[in-house]
């Protein structure tokens, strides 16, 4: 049980402070170096699945347009996507609860649900940011072709790296920062002369509107991803399906509020969430739901950087598929940009590029623990379990509660 930043052992009632963002990041790095072959296979499956789903998404959006416009409300697609993910989370929770062992706290118990809801209340923040980002995905399709949208989304990697450094205290080596710079260069090469000049929208040049949407399109989901990763890993003991239920539930609420707002401005007829939908939009909803579910596994069991680099690989699939099925031309800029992107990926994930701490990981963990205990000494001394805290032996499972087994 967690109270006031302190975790209480359910067996001996001793207390330990909650790990800091830096210790969460270091725990993941330590685990990654000792990762099993089975978990590596899981990562490969996650990356492959993410490449396929992310690559298909802009193509399905393009196929959903009629005469270059959407006949349906993008907010309705986002709402139906969140509802689909909520249903999936409920089904998986029921399946997981039936496989629980005797003596384990039931997942579907009211007390478990209420406590988990309190501990994961911060998931409402990334849910709101995701709701905004999902709407922007459709807006971006009005200004760029599918492969260009994917290349623009890769800008999130640099923003995410900066956010990880300041929010989760992740360390990146100079080589890794250079790899991110190469990624930006590759994207810039692909973006040369992609926006036609002379067109206007909302009274402003298309380029200006596109740049504004691009800035929001890159910043909002990056902040949501990092915040989501921290929220999921900080409550690692909570079932991922229960956490997803809260995240998707918040998302459904925010998108439904968006539908209500649209109905107030455009009239009651716009409240029909199924108006203008086709078979392509149904595939789009399923694809978006699968992306969201897969992303939660990335954030909890891997990290956001791996998720975004796997999305970068999807750029090739998107470019080739859009050329084959939609008639788009693969320019030399696109091919050169993709080459630089892959060089960046190889450099970033190279073993020689990994950042190393000046001190051993065990010593740094000991220092973090001592600093936390010093700051919380007054609280610990006031509790009846202070003596037990000094004698309680911490096992491997308790020392690293944020890592998958």
From Swiss-Prot:
Cellular localization per UniProt: Golgi apparatus membrane
Q: Which residues cross the membrane?
A: 44-64, 75-95, 122-142, 148-168, 172-192, 201-221, 245-265, 282-302, 323-343
Outline the segment boundaries, as ranges, of region: Disordered.
368-405
Q: Where is the composition biased (Basic and acidic residues)?
A: 389-405
Give the membrane topology: Multi-pass membrane protein
Q: Which residues lie on this side of the membrane: Lumenal?
A: 65-74, 143-147, 193-200, 266-281, 344-405
Alphabetically ordered keywords of this record? Golgi apparatus, Membrane, Sugar transport, Transmembrane, Transmembrane helix, Transport
What does UniProt give as GO cellular component? Golgi membrane
A GO biological-process term: transmembrane transport
InterPro entries, alphabetized: Nuc_sug_transpt (IPR007271)
Family as reported in the entry's similarity comment: Belongs to the nucleotide-sugar transporter family. CMP-Sialate:CMP antiporter (TC 2.A.7.12) subfamily.
Q: What does this protein do?
A: Sugar transporter involved in the transport of CMP-sialic acid from the cytoplasm into the Golgi. May transport important nucleotide sugars such as CMP-Kdo (2-keto-3-deoxy-D-manno-octulosonic acid) in physiological conditions.
Supply the name of the protein: CMP-sialic acid transporter 5
Tell me what organism the protein belongs to: Oryza sativa subsp. japonica (Rice)
